[in-house]
Swiss-Prot record:
Disulfide bonds: none annotated. Its EC number is 6.1.1.16. Pfam families: DALR_2, tRNA-synt_1e. Zn(2+) binds at residues 27, 207, 232, 236. It comes from Dehalococcoides mccartyi (strain CBDB1). ATP binds at residue 268. The keyword Zinc applies. Monomer. Its cofactor is Zn(2+). Its main location: cytoplasm. InterPro entries: Cys-tRNA-ligase, Cys-tRNA-synt_Ia_DALR, Cys-tRNA/MSH_ligase, Rossmann-like_a/b/a_fold, tRNA-synt_1_cat_dom, tRNAsynth_Ia_anticodon-bd. This is Cysteine--tRNA ligase. Belongs to the class-I aminoacyl-tRNA synthetase family. It is found in: Cytoplasm.
Length: 457
């Protein structure tokens, strides 16, 4: 299997650090608002990569963080007259609902930056002790000029970075490109005690600390959008390798292309968002997956209603194949399942070529439909069809869940328990209730007014 490594700029044979195991970290959202389909694109792609690695026999440990303290979260919370933590938790709930609705496998852990401050302070202190960072005015900065190979991920020198960036003049810094590991407190902002006074973590150090805590000093795959290559991921490498002394921090860097609306990237700052909730009100989760997977994960993707309508039609064709009932009167007909499986794995082994893998599933669907039209059936072909569809995360469910109303009191009790756990900041247990209910076909939806549940379709 070969994957494209942003660090080397070429396809490389995939050999994990430890035989049979894969440690995978994917940058999560900053929960300042509802998730949009740009997020769906990213997490669908990494979900499929994770599913395929699992299919190949690897034991994948998958971590995805929440940057739940940030300048934008603080500004939005202040504008709404609520605590930043309240805003972040509300949007985290909406995000997890959206991921469940998209049939995205839950992460093994969803660490929150605000819950990892002790580890962050430990890393910042260690970087100061080693001479890579300095404290001034209650803030702490990393000395990028001391970092060996700084710029190796984005393939740029410090001079090129300076020329291509709007560098704010800050008299505190020793060098303009030095970046904050710890920010001194400001009036009205959340803050934590530290050796440098009250303050809060810088963005980049949060992911370094969380990946170190949950995955160790080295990881196999680090994923994220191409807009995170610089400065975020470049700075993660600098911090992590300087702190641990172990190289490489990440063996394979994978970056997905960005979703566009017309000629512009879809983003909060541009205000051209289509939320996942809006998209799912018009199209099925399978249609969104087909839309995303019809292109390489590294390519940009342009959102259009026409493309999604075509994806929905494709999803419906696949659903009809998946829903086919066995007819004992039909003659068993051979399908070359080995050839289909080999095609599928050959494509996926080539940097997760989901477009060609998806085409293989459609070809198999057409053959199964042709066989049925000739009063035949293929038990093995039907089984392989569902297996390959599952690797791409396609549920292809036609019928509604038959969950009855008699379970309502039990579900309401679990919702109350989850609420109490969140108040007690037992977020991992609260998330486990959500994901367990999702597995059982119950979707939770959080809002300012509370939590409601519904049966997934």
């Amino acid at each position: 299997m070969k994957i494209y490594n942003t660090l080397s700029g070429k396809l490389e044979k995939f050999v994990p650090l430890e035989n049979g195991k894969v440690k995978m970290y994917v940058c999560g959202i900053t929960p300042q608002s509802e998730p949009h389909i740009g997020h769906a694109m990213s997490y669908i792609n990494f979900d499929v990569i994770r599913r395929y690695l699992t299919y190949k026999g690897y034991r994948v440990k998958y971590i995805q963080n929440f940057t739940d303290i940030d300048d934008k979260i603080i500004a939005k919370a202040n504008a709404q007259g609520i605590e930043p933590s309240t805003l972040a938790e509300r949007n985290i709930g909406v995000f997890l609902d959206a991921m469940a609705a998209l049939n995205i496998t839950p992460a093994d852990y969803y660490p929150r930056a605000t819950q990892e401050v002790p580890k962050i302070i430990e890393m910042v202190s260690g970087l100061i002790e080693k001479g890579y960072a300095y404290a001034v005015g209650g803030s702490v900065y990393l000395r990028v000029q001391k970092v060996d190979g700084y710029g190796k991920l984005s393939h740029r020198t410090l001079e090129q970075m300076m020329a291509g960036a709007r560098v704010e003049i800050d008299e505190e810094k020793e060098y303009p490109m030095d970046f904050a590991l710890w920010k001194a407190t400001k009036p009205g902002e959340p803050s934590w005690e530290s050796p440098w006074g009250l303050g809060r973590p810088g963005w980049h150090i949060e992911c370094s600390a969380m990946s170190l805590r949950y995955l160790g000093e080295q990881i196999d795959i680090h994923g994220g959008g191409q807009d995170l290559i610089f400065p975020h991921h470049e700075n993660e490498i600098a911090q992590s390798e300087c702190f641990s002394g172990v190289k490489p921090f990440v063996k394979y860097w994978l970056h997905n292309g960005l979703l566009k609306l017309g000629e512009e990237k879809m983003s909060k700052s541009l205000g051209n968002l289509v939320t996942i909730k809006e998209a799912l009100s018009r199209y099925s989760a399978d249609a969104l997956r087909i839309f995303v997977l019809s292109s390489s994960y590294r390519n940009p993707l342009t959102y259009s209603e026409e493309a999604l309508e075509a994806a929905e039609k494709g999803a419906e064709r696949l659903r009809q194949t998946a829903a086919r009932k066995d007819n004992p009167q039909f003659k068993e007909t051979a399908v070359d399942t080995k050839a289909y499986r080999e095609r599928f794995t050959q494509y996926m082994d080539n940097d997760f070529n989901t477009s060609a893998a998806l085409a293989t599933i459609f070809d198999l669907s057409r053959e199964l439909n042709r066989i049925e039209g000739e009063a035949g059936k293929s038990t093995d072909g039907q089984k392989l069809f569902k297996e390959l569809a599952d690797i791409l995360g396609l549920s292809l469910i036609v019928a509604e869940s038959k969950t009855g109303t008699d379970v309502a009191p039990f579900i309401e009790l679990l919702i109350e328990l989850r609420k109490d756990l969140r108040v007690a900041k037992q977020y991992q247990l609260a998330d486990k209730i959500r994901t367990s209910l999702d597995t059982a076909g119950i979707l939770l939806e959080d809002s300012a007014g509370g939590t409601v549940w519904k049966v997934k379709k």
